[in-house]
Amino acid sequence: MPELPEVETMRRGIAGVAGCRIEGVEVPRTGLQPIQLAPALPVLRRRLTGQRIEAVDRLGKRVVLVLDSGQRLIIEPRMTGRVLLDEPPNRSHLRLVLRLSGGSQRQLLFWDVRGLGVVRLLTEEELSSQLGPRKLGPDALEISAEELRRRLSASRRPIKVALMDQQILAGIGNLYASEILHRAGLHPRLGCRRIGRSDWDVLIDSIREVLQEAIAAQGSTLSDGTYRNARNQAGGYQQRHRVYQRTGKPCLGCGRGEILRIVQAQRSTFFCPICQPRRRTSGKST
């Protein structure tokens, strides 16, 4: 599932559509179960056509087109969605096409193999109600160590599970939670209330470092190949994963531990028992 680095890469890749007008909205006939559109296509087409895209933003794991009407088009890739400028790998999984001003071939595409993505057109009031601060936590790249500590220090939940709670902080999913905790030297089962004050600083530094490095590498394209950037190119951060999907392999941090896999909240977690001891006594992993 695309997480913050992948969605931020998508956002940057399509940033050039700012200033374009939406001249047409199409949902290709594929014979597949359609993705969730809100409102329904006829209303969506009417409300979008003629709108100018003022900016391209990101909200957690969502791409946001800011329109001159004040409305926001929210594109949520979910498991396998891609936001593309170029032709997709195939047209059988092409779910939405926005025809743009600036040339007959200019378009913005949403392509999704599994069809779990969601596209919503929201007013400012609807955005605040559905994705405002009460529903979505601060962005993972912007939250401070003190704010993260305030939100989690009394929680009994394991830190790995808490990091993936989008109401606590937005953008981190299963992959980057494992990588961040390895960087910070924190065991994924460590209860939030047992994390020391100085360790919150280490954790927030690790969050920023891992996410920014992943963005610089244009995200992670895993073995299933589902994520690619707006030009349909693979990301490169998967080559730098220290723990994710490396069960049984030597730790790339300490060189002595063997990466273990456990299940938390029905998701796989990967960690090094040496770099991330259950009772933490040392600093961040190098």
Role assignments for model-derived ranges:
Residues 1-286:
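Structured catalytic/nucleic-acid-binding cores of DNA maintenance enzymes
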